[in-house]
Amino acid sequence: MFQDNIFNQWIYNMNRRNFIKRVGLLGAGYALNKNLMFANSGVASTATSFSSFPTVRKPISERNFKSPAIEKAITTFKQKVKNEELCWLFGNCFPNTLDTTVFYSEKDGRPDTYVITGDIDAMWLRDSSAQVYPYLDFMSEDKNLQRLIIGVINKQTSFILKDPYANAFYDDDTKYTRWNSDHTEMKPGIHERKYELDSLCYPIRLAYGYWKKTNDASPFDAQWKKAIETVLRVCKEQQRKHGNGPYSFRRTSEWAIDAVPMGGVGYKVNPVGLICSTFRPSDDATIFPFLVPSNFFAVASLRQASEMVQKITKDNVLADELL
């Protein structure tokens, strides 16, 4: 099986990993408890009153998307947390994605959501997933918010099918990027074509989280299944058991972080089953292509995809291949 092929050599570490995980959870719980004690202690912040903090949210009329459930969550937070600076910070940061970076529409009667990073008019598969993930818990209170997230899933599906090796895309399929001179298979509608393994994992994480919260399988149609098959194909290609695969990347640049050695495919690896990632989540080129955290992420994501494929599409062959 695919997953076993990657990580059989790491099974013996499971007990150690469980121990580290438990110790980490205990430490995190202790730190969280201390932070909550501080938050509720009424300790004076650097400002004297809540009114002295600047308002940085857009005016209501200029916000890209409005969610009553999110506004309610902000109000509840302010009622329960006494520290005014934390309340101010949460009230400005938590809704920022909805206020400033999402653009909801419908295409062919289906939700379609374009999510920019904030400073660049482009949608990263990784960033967009992480930007909306905190809102999953509020979908049951706000059906429009749920449709917005369905739109993100639909958009990501279309992007993966367009080019699974690209990391960032435009809403406009005809738009050309400043990186169009990169030495790789650039297409219109693609902002950047840096292959990052985690970029293919994040959309699965979002889809799985949505499905578990709602039990709604409507976004997971034949196109979505095709996207999952595409992700699996890329993972197999980048195990590099039969050559370097179809992807390469070079850029004319003075910055080493954008330079991929060995003709744009990276340094050679011993094909042991791990998946190569040409770039890190930071968009910087890897020196050692076996990026271990992203490989762990891939195992978790492929397991999630397998569960969804088996239960939603009933394709047991693909479900087994994903494991």
Segment roles from a protein language model:
Residues D121-I149, I153-A256:
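Aromatic-rich carbohydrate-recognition surfaces in CAZymes
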